Amino acid sequence: MELLRAENIQKVYNTRAGGKPCRALAGVSFSVEAGEFVAIMGASGSGKSTLLNILATLDTPTSGEVFLEGQSMKQIKGKNLAAFRREKLGFVFQDFNLLDTFTVRDNILLPLVLSRTPLAEMEQRLKPVVASLGIEPLLEHFPVEISGGEKQRTAVARAVINEPRLILADEPTGALDSRSSQQLLNIFDRLNEQGQTLLMVTHSSLAASHARRVLFIRDGKLFAELCRGDQSQQVFYDRITASLSMATHQGGESL
């Protein structure tokens, strides 16, 4: 079943008076099925983060339309948009976006607090999430007291606590060491195996190889796609790196 669809997304930024407009996205179209794990790969400035922000309703396209479960995001306004984002989407960012004055517990529960979820239900949801991510002992700590990997696991807990239809991840391993990156990717694998739909923007071939499908973006356009099928993560990683090498050899920009 189709969960997300982007139709001919274009984004143009106007520069200062007299300057030439900057086209960040040039007619991007694709869809994501429920339960898929899709990665979008591209170099810095390729348009991948702009695309993610539009899919997340954090930015609006100059033209084109995004649908989630058949509902056009263009038709959702104001407070309804904030509620839609809070209830349907989960976010994992490179820099964690945790509130320093909130404990780990409070950071995780924030989406439920904003949704006015009853306290008993919040606690009921919290326990299995933090147990599965191994952060139960950290609940009363503040972000400054925990490691980068622990911060990102806290961010994942916050993303899944509201049981979103779609998790959007923007360079989630970018600020992590190799060990913490692998732990996070294993968590994404497990979430996907449990039926969670994920869309991840990354420049890392290793991170992308954990997805089931990879879309490649350059100069605001999708130019290639790889599907993992029954291949192992290692074999898919080799295919991704080979595809990137070929794209560079043919005049494309290295990722």
What are these regions (language model features)?
Residues M41-A43:
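The feature captures the beta-strand-to-loop junction immediately N-terminal to the Walker
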Residues A56:
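Helix-to-loop junction immediately C-terminal to a conserved catalytic motif
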Residues G64-S72:
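Conserved ABC transporter NBD signature motif
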Residues F102-L110:
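Short coil-to-helix segment of the ABC ATPase nucleotide-binding domain corresponding to the Q-loop/switch region
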Residues F142-I146, E150-Q152:
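Conserved ABC ATPase signature
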Residues I161-R165:
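A short, proline-enriched helix->beta-strand linker immediately N-terminal to the Walker B motif
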Residues I167-D170:
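Catalytic Walker B motif of ABC-type/P-loop ATPase nucleotide-binding domains
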